[in-house]
UniProtKB/Swiss-Prot annotation:
Its EC number is 1.5.1.39. FMN binds at R12, E90, Y91, N92, G93, Y120. It is an enzyme of class 1 (oxidoreductase). It catalyses: FMNH2 + NADP(+) = FMN + NADPH + 2 H(+); FMNH2 + NAD(+) = FMN + NADH + 2 H(+). This is NAD(P)H-dependent FMN reductase atnL. Homodimer.
Amino acid sequence: MSKIALITGSTRTPRVGTDVAAWVLDVIKSRPEDKLQVEPLSIADFNLPIYDEPVMPAMVPAMKQFTKEHSKKWSEAIQSFQGYVFVIPEYNGSMSGATKNAVDYLYNEWPGKPVAIVSYGTQGGERANKHLSESLELVMKMKVAPTKVTLAFAPGTDVFAAINEGVLGEDTRKAWTEAGHKEKILKAFGEVKEILEQ
């Protein structure tokens, strides 16, 4: 059975990313799946500093050649999956530094694997989604699902709760459902599955 990592890209505290990722995971698991196992993975759990290995990631052909324990653990975790779903915030018009740093830590673990991208933010994180998609497809040589999911918080108190308390509000959950985002997530995940089956 192939394994898919659902990667939470935010590392700040508090962060709503864990709630968003849990919501996405619930959506994916709402459709019975017998060929793919989806597991949550949080970048924050790896405590990655700004890249500090002595060689470029592309020059590390094997995980054992990393010199730092955090690099080895991150490489080993990513290598163990056959595909990915990134759940990322938008910071200042792009992906978060933590997301970019985590992606850039590795190279040989990524190419050829399928990935879907779900972004979120006050306006849905469209630019973060686009920038990560370009990085993964053009540089890391991954196969990016065509369907991109952008989730905007409901206006008012939900925005405050998301940004300042790390809480995903009920109005936002309802708005995402009514806007058809659950269906888009399932479509994007289906595209990941199709790529794996090719």
